[in-house]
Amino acid sequence: GLRRGDSDFDYVSAGDINRNGLIDAYDISVVATQLEDGIENPGTDRVAGTIFLSTPKQTYNAGETVEITVKGDSVKAVNALSFALPYDQQDYDFVGIEPANLGTMENLTYDRLHTSGQKALYPTFVNLGDKQVLEGSEDLFTIKLKTKRKVTFNLKAVDGILVDKNLNMQKF
């Protein structure tokens, strides 16, 4: 979740392998695919599909919990995923993530306050070593936010990527 411009980005900027100004699932995958004896035969399946977010309603009163369902849509060969969910800290507090259908992926989600003052949640899930990839269309996890005041939910995922075992990327 570190972005170019954060006070500590320069310390880890060499880890921004894809040079997009953000430490994301791709950068983490470069190392993660080599852990736990690595991936001997990554196969030829190329990453595909998309991810979308939904909530049961649009308007929430202060103190309510917003449950954001994160669903994979026709995903194929997904070995890692990440996106940013910028939000106004005057409106929400991050409560947690409930994994649903993520297999053995490690949850590396981080709720970050950037040096610029922008708050963003970075849901990030990565397989370490050679593990089962995500396939199909199903709910992957739920993000829970607590409202601080009455809000109309309009948060959007940005900088979303899916990564396969060969480090091919699919943006969403």
Which residue ranges define each predicted feature?
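Glycine-rich, flexible loop segments associated with nucleotide phosphate handling
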Residues: 10-15, 48
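Alpha-helical context
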Residues: 7, 11, 59-61
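Alpha-helical segments with a strong preference for the paired helices of cellulosomal dockerin domains
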Residues: 1-8, 20-42
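Acidic, low-complexity intrinsically disordered segments
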Residues: 29, 33-172
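Residue-level detector of alpha-helix boundaries and kinks
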Residues: 16-17, 128
